[in-house]
Amino acid sequence: MGTTINLTAADGHEFAAYRAPHEGAYKGGLVLIQEIFGVTPHIKDLCNEFADLGYDVLSPAIFDRIERDAEFGYDEDQIQKSVALAGQSGIEAPILDIQACVDHLKVDGPVAITGFCYGGSLVWISAARVQGLSCAVGYYGRLIPDHLGEQPACPTMLHFGSRDASIPLTSVDKIRDARPEVDIHVFDAEHGFCSDRPQNHSTDAKAAALALTLGFFDTHMID
C-alpha cells in the first residue's frame, strides 16, 4: 500500500520516510514515529491502518543519520543495538526530520503526530518543539518523565499500560502532576500493547486507545 520516499531536513540531511496515502475521505496528515526497532513491517502496518482511516501518513527513518535502513529484531542483542543507535541519534536531529515531515504534509491540511515507545517519547518533545502540529498523541513513551521541562505547544494525549514494567504508574503520576493539561489514559496492558509481539499485544487496549486517539484527532485537526 505504501512507498518509501526521500525527504530533506533543514540541515540538508536526506532521509527515507514510509508514506501511506489516505483511503476514502481525507482527514489530514499524520507523522507516525517508529519504535526503537526502526521503520519495521509492524510500523508500516500501523501507517497503513491510519491511512485506511483517511490520513496521509509519513514515518521517518529516524536512524538514517547514523545507519541507513536500520531495522532490528526483538532479541536482547538487537535491542541493545537499537538502544545504542537511539542514544547516538540524540534529540535535536530527529526533531529536524520530524519537522520536515510536518512541512511536507502541511501543504494539504492539518497535521498530527503519533508514535510508539521510543517514538512516544519523541512525540512528547515534538509537541513542544515542532511547528505546525494540530495535536500530538504518544504511546508509552518511557523517556517522557525525563523531559517534563518540555511544554507542549499543541493539545497532547498520552497512552500507557498499567502493567508496563518500564513505565511504573508512579512515573505516569509524575507526568500528570507536572502537566495537568495533558490528556492521559492508562489501560490494563503491558508496555507495547499496540506492538506485534504476542507477549505485549493487547487487542482491547489497542482498540480503546485508538478510539480515543481518533476522537482527539477529530477534535483538533481543524483546517
What is the predicted function of each stretch?
Residues 1-223:
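N-terminal cap/leader regions of alpha/beta-hydrolase-fold enzymes
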